[in-house]
Swiss-Prot record:
Transmembrane segments: none annotated. Gene3D superfamilies: MatP, N-terminal domain, Met repressor-like. This is Macrodomain Ter protein. It comes from Klebsiella pneumoniae subsp. pneumoniae (strain ATCC 700721 / MGH 78578). Keywords: Cell cycle, Cell division, Cytoplasm, DNA-binding.
Amino acid sequence: MKYQQLENLESGWKWKYLVKKHREGELITRYIEASAAQAAVDDLLTLENEPVLVHAWIEQHMNPALMNRMKQTIRARRKRHFNAEHQHTRKKSIDLEFVVWQRLAGLAQRRGKTLSETIVQLIEDAEHKEKYASKMSSLKHDLQVLLGKE
């Protein structure tokens, strides 16, 4: 496992995930009967700051179909949490117009690289081009000086 699991922190994430799914109208409990489901949800809503009880609630009441999705969400959240600790792993976002994103995605796909790798490669190409142009300009100037054509 690459990232350490922090039970109390992740329990809070799980609680927030379940409450969000409930508010979005998803069935978060294993119960078909509405009153039993509502009683379980009401119980969950009181457990916000009780990590051990949230875990017990999940074991006892949660809809099994939701388990895999919740695990994936928590795994992604854990990764973002630990990556945010270091500048070099912290993710940033940029807004692109759809047409720009489409062209960039197409280029990345043709090159077999990620969007980030493609952007870095384009920046490096532009830097090399600038360096080459500067070097050529300098050589041209030096050649003109040698030939006495200032």
